[in-house]
């Protein structure tokens, strides 16, 4: 009997323990279900908030897009007042204190930075690349000039001097280090018009992997005070950022004439441009691999400070071609032309008239145009005679193209 009672008690205890476990599991399940419901509610709330925030973001993006819509005004940042306000100068010459759009990266807002201003409120709404507001154009490897040394007739001495001063320092810089000398920093090309100065500069750019920046001296003369010196700084900064590079300034006499006691604001501004150019050339680091080529037809008017060694170390003269040079130029130009066997180029080479390479090119072009006018595919001696007389304007009474 005692054993039966003990067994019954054990069964009772086991049932009670099982009941308690079921109750605990039920409580845990209810607790987890309530947490799940809470999380579901939170999820729905977060989804709702996400939709609202996304709607607000799209609205804000549309508003920023509307504010930045063109046309915009171009200006220059002078200084920052605080993180949300700055002082700018617009292209109209006005100096303004303006608000700055909150989405603009403040690291890009440096003094002299080019900025875009909203046309109604003048608020600063965007930053621009430094070269975006100027006429400076950097020619990459795929935009290089197509002219090569073989396209230039004659000028062997000029080609050699140019290669030594510009091409070799860019392609074999270590050669100058081993010899222990500094390569020339700048080259001046001077001579009469049409003698191949610009063409040789293009050929050097074609034969090197350097970036090529071409500007004309008159482009530095701007309407507003200080714009010209800033363009000079932009040219040299762009060259340093893309080194090795070649800066070619054509018609340098537009800004580099001898200084004098200027009486007008325009003359003083041109002299400030020249001083900035001198300063930029003095600040050159030889190791940067940036070469400056300048060309002019009036070397006698240039300022002596620009011509001194250390700025323009090499000066290359381009005289009018002699008889041998004229022969080579004629051969290069006519190599792709369909000439009659009767055409004797030596007759035109031996004539005493002083001709530049551009005038020889004009003679050949006029000869070809005369053949086209007569519906011929072959250029005859009389076409060359017509072209010769038309180009050098010897006989104006024969300047009748249709006879």
UniProtKB/Swiss-Prot annotation:
Subcellular location: Cytoplasm; Nucleus
Residues annotated as binding ATP: 191-198
Keyword field contains Nucleus: yes
One function term, GO molecular function aspect: ATP hydrolysis activity
Ribosomal protein is among the record's keywords: no
Keyword tags: Acetylation, ATP-binding, Cytoplasm, Nucleotide-binding, Nucleus, Proteasome
SUPFAM superfamilies: P-loop containing nucleoside triphosphate hydrolases (SSF52540)
GO biological process: hyperosmotic response; proteasome-mediated ubiquitin-dependent protein catabolic process
Pfam families for this protein: AAA, AAA_lid_3, Prot_ATP_ID_OB_C
SMART domains: AAA
Cellular component aspect of the GO annotation: nucleus; phagocytic vesicle; proteasome regulatory particle; proteasome regulatory particle, base subcomplex
Family annotation (PROSITE patterns): AAA
Domain of life: Eukaryota
Protein family membership: Belongs to the AAA ATPase family.
Protein name in the entry: 26S proteasome regulatory subunit 6B homolog
Native source species: Dictyostelium discoideum
């Amino acid at each position: 009997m005692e054993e039966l009672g003990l067994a019954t008690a054990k069964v009772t205890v086991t049932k009670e323990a099982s009941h308690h476990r079921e109750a605990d599991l039920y409580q845990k399940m209810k607790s987890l279900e309530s947490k799940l419901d809470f999380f579901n509610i939170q999820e729905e709330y977060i989804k709702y908030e996400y939709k609202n925030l996304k709607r607000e973001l799209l609205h804000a993006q549309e508003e920023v897009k509307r504010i930045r819509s063109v046309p915009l005004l171009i200006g220059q940042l002078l200084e920052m007042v605080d993180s949300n306000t700055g002082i700018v100068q617009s292209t109209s010459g006005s100096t303004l204190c303006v608000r700055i759009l909150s989405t603009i990266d403040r690291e890009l807002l440096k003094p002299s930075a080019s900025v875009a201003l909203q046309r109604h409120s003048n608020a600063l709404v965007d930053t621009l690349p430094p070269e975006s507001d100027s006429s400076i154009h950097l020619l990459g490897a795929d935009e290089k000039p197509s002219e090569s040394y073989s396209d230039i007739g004659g000028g062997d001495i000029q080609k050699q001097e140019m290669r030594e001063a510009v091409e070799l320092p860019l392609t074999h810089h270590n050669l100058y280090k081993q010899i222990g000398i500094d390569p020339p920093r700048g080259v001046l090309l001077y001579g009469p018009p049409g003698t191949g100065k610009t063409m040789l500069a293009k050929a050097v750019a074609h034969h090197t992997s350097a970036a090529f920046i071409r500007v004309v001296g008159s482009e530095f003369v701007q309407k507003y005070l200080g714009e010209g010196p800033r363009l000079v700084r932009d040219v040299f900064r762009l060259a340093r950022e893309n080194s090795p590079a070649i800066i070619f300034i054509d018609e340098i006499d537009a800004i580099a004439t001898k200084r004098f006691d200027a009486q007008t604001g325009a003359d003083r501004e041109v002299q400030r441009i020249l001083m900035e150019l001198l300063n930029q050339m003095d600040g050159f680091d030889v190791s940067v691999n940036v070469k400056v080529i300048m060309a002019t037809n009036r070397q006698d008017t240039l300022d002596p400070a620009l011509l001194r060694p250390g700025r323009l170390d090499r000066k290359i003269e381009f005289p009018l071609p002699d008889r041998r040079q004229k022969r080579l130029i004629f051969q290069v130009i006519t190599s792709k032309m369909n000439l009659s066997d009767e055409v004797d180029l030596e007759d035109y080479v031996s004539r005493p008239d002083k001709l530049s390479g551009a005038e020889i090119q004009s003679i050949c072009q006029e000869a070809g145009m005369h053949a086209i006018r007569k519906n011929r595919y072959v250029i005859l001696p009389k076409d060359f005679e017509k072209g010769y007389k038309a180009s050098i304007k010897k006989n104006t009474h024969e300047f009748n193209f249709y006879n």
